[in-house]
Amino acid sequence: MRTLTLLITLLLLALHTQAESPQERAKAAPDQDMVMEDQDIFISFGGYKGTVLQDAVVKAGQACYCRIGACVSGERLTGACGLNGRIYRLCCR
């Protein structure tokens, strides 16, 4: 049930991202040009034990990153993450 909830949440996020108006995309375009190809963002999941994201995606002791490109050596693709209205790969070690 938790996995289903996570998948539905990711689907809704993807649909919302694609439903943005062209004006919103035009405003965001200059910011996206400044993003470097090798930039990564550290994702930390806080909150109560047993949250849907912690149970479905992140196990204790794992470090996850929101990657623009492919996962680096030693990481595996675990899911998707969003940043500035775009969907990226969630890579965990």
From Swiss-Prot:
Major localisation: secreted
Q: Which PROSITE patterns match?
A: DEFENSIN (PS00269)
Q: Which SMART domains match?
A: Defensin_propep, DEFSN
Q: Which InterPro entries match?
A: Alpha-defensin, Alpha-defensin_C, Alpha-defensin_N, Beta/alpha-defensin_C
GO biological process per UniProt: antibacterial humoral response; antimicrobial humoral immune response mediated by antimicrobial peptide; cellular response to lipopolysaccharide; defense response; defense response to fungus; defense response to Gram-negative bacterium; defense response to Gram-positive bacterium; disruption of plasma membrane integrity in another organism
Q: Which Pfam families match?
A: Defensin_1, Defensin_propep
Cite the entry's keywords alphabetically: Antibiotic, Antimicrobial, Defensin, Disulfide bond, Fungicide, Secreted, Signal
The record's Gene Ontology cellular component field reads:
azurophil granule; extracellular space
Compartments where located: Secreted
**Disulfide bridge partners, by residue number:** 64-92, 66-81, 71-91
**Cell inner membrane among the record's keywords?**
no
Q: In which tissues is it expressed?
A: Expressed in neutrophils (at protein level). Highest expression in bone marrow and to a much lesser extent in small intestine.
Propeptide position ranges: 20-62
Coiled-coil regions listed in the entry: none
Q: Which residues form the signal peptide?
A: 1-19
Q: Which GO terms describe its molecular function?
A: protein homodimerization activity
- Role summary: Host-defense peptide that has antimicrobial activity against Gram-positive and Gram-negative bacteria and fungi (in vitro). Exhibits activity against E.coli, A.calcoaceticus, S,aureus and C.albicans.
Q: Which family does it belong to?
A: Belongs to the alpha-defensin family.
Q: What is this protein called?
A: Defensin alpha 4
The gene coding this protein:
Np4
